[in-house]
Regions:
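Glycine-rich phosphate-binding loop of nucleotide-binding enzymes
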Residues: 1-75, 130, 161, 201
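Switch/coupling segment of Walker-type NTPase motor domains
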Residues: 15-19, 44-124
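Hydrophobic pocket-lining residues within nucleotide cofactor-binding pockets
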Residues: 22, 112, 204
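Envelope-exposed proteins and targeting segments
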Residues: 25, 103-105, 138
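Conserved P-loop NTPase motor cores
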Residues: 27-28, 33-35, 39, 117-220
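Conserved AAA+ ATPase small/helical "lid" subdomain
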Residues: 226-227
Length: 227
């Protein structure tokens, strides 16, 4: 196991986040399109990769491919160009690589024509990681882009959503952390957001989204993210 720092710096200000909370806690990053939310998530990933820590990134739009330019990270996808072509039957192998092989993995879903196939892959991989962590208890972070697609505020969660809720509620005891990312906090299940140990808010403009911030953090915070 590599030597792990107590904190990492994720912004220029700087803002520090405790590594232990990142790896085994629950976090949420939000902001309108172009506000920097995915960049913040990338910086978090880069800082953890810098010290040799593995993670799983659920990449819905192929945004994290650039991490390969600087780090040893396994890019998995359904189409050519990936390091490893995968489907749901590879779930146990991927979980083993991540936890036992200490391999950081990008689960790139951007090539799926049928989104249900991508959802099945996510579900099975995370389920395998959750199962294996019952014995291993190894600090490990799962980063999920567009988490509102799996944990919507309205409508059924589906199998993957229920699994993510389980990770959020019970993952810490197994060493599992979860970081959700969305440009629409109003569209994300508030039961998840309110359970988060850390929150990163970038600029938001839509009233429903700023209302969520006001409810959680107060009027001053809601005003500041509109500026």
């Amino acid at each position: 196991m590599p030597e792990v720092p107590e904190t990492i710096v994720v912004t220029e200000e700087p803002i520090e986040l405790p590594v232990a909370e990142l790896l085994t806690g629950r976090g949420f990053i939000t902001g309108k399109s172009g506000s920097g939310k995915s960049n913040t998530a990338s910086v978090i990933a880069e800082e953890l990769l810098e010290v040799g820590l593995p993670m799983l990134i659920v990449d819905t739009d192929g945004e994290y491919f650039g991490l390969q330019e600087r780090y040893e990270i396994l890019h998995t996808a359904v189409d050519d160009g990936a390091d490893m072509l995968v489907d749901a039957d590879d779930a146990e192998r991927l979980a083993g690589l991540a936890l036992d092989g200490n391999v950081p993995i990008i689960l790139d879903l951007s090539g799926y024509v049928d989104p249900t196939e991508g959802t099945e892959l996510i579900t099975r991989v995370i389920r395998e990681i959750f199962r294996m962590e019952d014995a291993r208890r190894k600090p490990f972070l799962i980063i999920v882009e567009e988490i509102h697609e799996y944990l919507p505020e309205q409508g059924a969660h589906g199998e993957v959503g229920e699994l993510l809720i389980q990770v959020a509620k019970r993952g810490r005891k197994r060493g599992l952390g979860l970081c959700g990312i969305s440009q629409r906090p109003a569209a994300v299940d508030k039961n998840f957001i309110t359970q988060c140990d850390w929150l990163v808010w970038h600029r938001l403009t839509w009233k429903n989204d700023t209302t969520v911030v006001r409810q959680l953090l107060g009027a001053d915070s809601a005003a500041s993210i509109q500026e």
